């Protein structure tokens, strides 16, 4: 199974990778840490079976040359999904986020609502979301179930 984990949090990536390896055996896992490197991975010749996608990532990896826009992109995951649809990439994608709400002040929106909108708009791509929490094991059960159902 070829899996792309797109997340800027190294610890979260490590925990996700361990969860996959423990429950699905050895997998070919590619890791990206920004919006740009995620798009590059998706448009490369590699075809992934599953994408685990964080919702908030920087525009560029901090190690990329000419990185003068490493600002956080609050809805990077949503933007990745939109680009996937535009390019005809329909790899099953599970959003894995630590945040329950996105936005600012009066424009706050819960991840459950964002995910439902994405599932409705891109049903061939978005297969749900998992609320990641290092203090709990519930996210693992949810993620394993969602991957198994694919």
UniProtKB/Swiss-Prot annotation:
Keywords of the record: Antiviral defense, Phosphoprotein, Two-component regulatory system
One GO term of the biological process aspect: phosphorelay signal transduction system
InterPro entries associated with the record: CheY-like_superfamily
Post-translational modification: Probably phosphorylated by DtcA.
Domain Response regulatory: 2-150
Modification 4-aspartylphosphate occurs at: 54
Keyword Transmembrane: no
Gene: dtcB
Keyword Phosphoprotein: yes
Entry comment, domain topic: Consists solely of a response regulatory domain.
Species this protein is from: Enterobacter cloacae (strain JD6301)
SUPFAM superfamilies: CheY-like (SSF52172)
Source lineage: Bacteria, Pseudomonadati, Pseudomonadota, Gammaproteobacteria, Enterobacterales
Role played: Possible phosphate scavenger member of the two-component regulatory system Detocs that confers resistance to bacteriophage. When the system (DtcA-DtcB-DtcC) is expressed in a susceptible E.coli (strain MG1655) it confers resistance to bacteriophages T2, T4, T5, T7, SECphi4, SECphi6 and SECphi27; the level of resistance varies, resistance to T2, T7 and SECphi4 is not very high.
Name of this chain's protein: Detocs response regulatory protein DtcB
């Amino acid at each position: 199974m070829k899996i792309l984990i797109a997340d800027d949090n190294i610890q979260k990536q490590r925990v996700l990778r361990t969860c996959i390896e423990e429950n699905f055996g050895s997998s070919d896992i590619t890791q990206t840490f920004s919006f740009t490197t995620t798009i590059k991975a998706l448009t490369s010749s590699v075809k992934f079976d599953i994408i685990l996608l964080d919702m908030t990532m920087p525009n560029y990896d901090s190690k990329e040359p000419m990185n003068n826009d490493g600002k956080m992109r609050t809805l990077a995951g949503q933007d990745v999904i939109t680009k996937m649809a535009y390019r005809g990439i329909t790899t099953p994608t599970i959003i894995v986020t630590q945040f329950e709400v996105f936005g600012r002040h009066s424009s706050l929106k819960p991840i459950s609502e964002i995910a439902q909108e994405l599932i409705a708009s891109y049903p061939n791509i978005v297969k749900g979301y998992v609320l990641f929490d290092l203090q709990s094991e519930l996210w693992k059960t949810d993620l394993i179930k969602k991957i198994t159902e694919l």
